[in-house]
């Protein structure tokens, strides 16, 4: 049996994507919509307090296309906290005018290739990646993915050293986009329908296309990658939520 990779796990992650029922939203009076927006922003303010205390992080983006209208990415120390956040949001008035579009549950993950005598949880660089402060980049791209398990193209039957070598080559492409694209990898085996979630942040949305296209030619993606639905969006600052929901 091939050897399993040891992973380092950080904050739990929820991607919550929803569509707005604009027709129903329009039936509310201006005052009712205003109250609903204020209630939602009060919930977001709680998230801001958690982020300020460095006990979690979140991001809020509008989604381009018909797949959804809004994407929330929430990071917390426990799965219970993610559930509480989702439940609190579902109890708001605004949620009555939202339709669930997609969700993804995972945990921020890094592969542990450090020397056995080094404690990765004492390494500041690793801690910053396991418990990240999500950037306020202009754009987001999220997609789930698997490693292929078909015939001779079975990632999980490859020897550990071969997988390490290929992943090192794969990661070199990503490092070429340092400063242009910020990446958060989250593991989801046993949590959701795919094995990983990939979240990319960039101020220049075209960098998503360039990075992902270049990686397609790397063996890890070309031979072993299986990809789910892609979602791309634009940042939604707190101060622009009211404008976004204005009728």
UniProtKB/Swiss-Prot annotation:
Keyword Heme included in the entry's annotation: yes
Any one Gene Ontology BP term: heme B biosynthetic process
Family membership noted in the UniProt record: Belongs to the ChdC family. Type 1 subfamily.
This protein's UniProt keywords: Heme, Heme biosynthesis, Iron, Metal-binding, Oxidoreductase
SUPFAM superfamilies according to UniProt: Dimeric alpha+beta barrel
Catalytic reaction annotation: Fe-coproporphyrin III + 2 H2O2 + 2 H(+) = heme b + 2 CO2 + 4 H2O; Fe-coproporphyrin III + H2O2 + H(+) = harderoheme III + CO2 + 2 H2O; harderoheme III + H2O2 + H(+) = heme b + CO2 + 2 H2O
Listed cofactors: Fe-coproporphyrin III
Protein name, entry field: Coproheme decarboxylase
Entry EC no(s): 1.3.98.5
Taxonomy, superkingdom: Bacteria
Biological or metabolic pathway of the protein: Porphyrin-containing compound metabolism; protoheme biosynthesis
InterPro entries from the UniProt entry: CHDC (IPR031332), ChdC/CLD (IPR010644), Dimeric_a/b-barrel (IPR011008)
PANTHER family: COPROHEME DECARBOXYLASE, HEME-DEPENDENT PEROXIDASE YWFI-RELATED
GO molecular function term, any single one: peroxidase activity
Record has Iron as a keyword: yes
Active site: 143
Binding locations of Fe-coproporphyrin III: 129, 143-147, 170, 183, 221
Function: Involved in coproporphyrin-dependent heme b biosynthesis. Catalyzes the decarboxylation of Fe-coproporphyrin III (coproheme) to heme b (protoheme IX), the last step of the pathway. The reaction occurs in a stepwise manner with a three-propionate intermediate.
Cofactor binding, note field: Fe-coproporphyrin III acts both as a substrate and a redox cofactor.
């Amino acid at each position: 049996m091939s050897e399993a990779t040891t992973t380092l796990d950080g904050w739990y992650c929820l991607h919550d994507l929803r569509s707005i029922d604009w027709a129903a939203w329009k039936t509310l009076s201006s005052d009712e919509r205003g109250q609903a927006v204020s209630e939602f922003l009060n919930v977001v303010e709680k998230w801001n307090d958690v982020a300020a205390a460095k006990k979690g992080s979140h991001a809020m983006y509008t989604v381009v296309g018909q797949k959804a209208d809004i994407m929330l990415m929430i990071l917390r120390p426990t799965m219970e906290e993610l559930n509480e956040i989702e439940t609190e949001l579902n109890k708001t008035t605004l949620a009555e005018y939202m339709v669930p579009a997609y969700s993804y549950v995972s945990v921020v993950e890094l592969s542990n290739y450090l020397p056995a005598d080094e404690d990765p949880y004492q390494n500041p660089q690793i801690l910053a990646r396991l418990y990240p402060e999500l950037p306020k980049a202009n754009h987001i791209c999220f997609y789930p993915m698997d490693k292929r398990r078909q015939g001779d193209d079975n990632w999980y039957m490859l020897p550990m050293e071969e997988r390490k070598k290929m992943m090192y080559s794969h990661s070199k492409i990503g490092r070429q986009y340092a400063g242009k694209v910020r990446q958060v990898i989250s593991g989801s085996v046993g949590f959701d329908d795919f094995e990983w979630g990939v979240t990319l942040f960039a101020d220049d949305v075209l960098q998503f296309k360039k990075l992902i296209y270049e990686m397609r030619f790397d063996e890890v993606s070309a031979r072993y990658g299986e990809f789910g639905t892609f979602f791309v969006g634009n940042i939604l600052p707190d101060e622009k939520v009211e404008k976004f929901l204005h009728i």
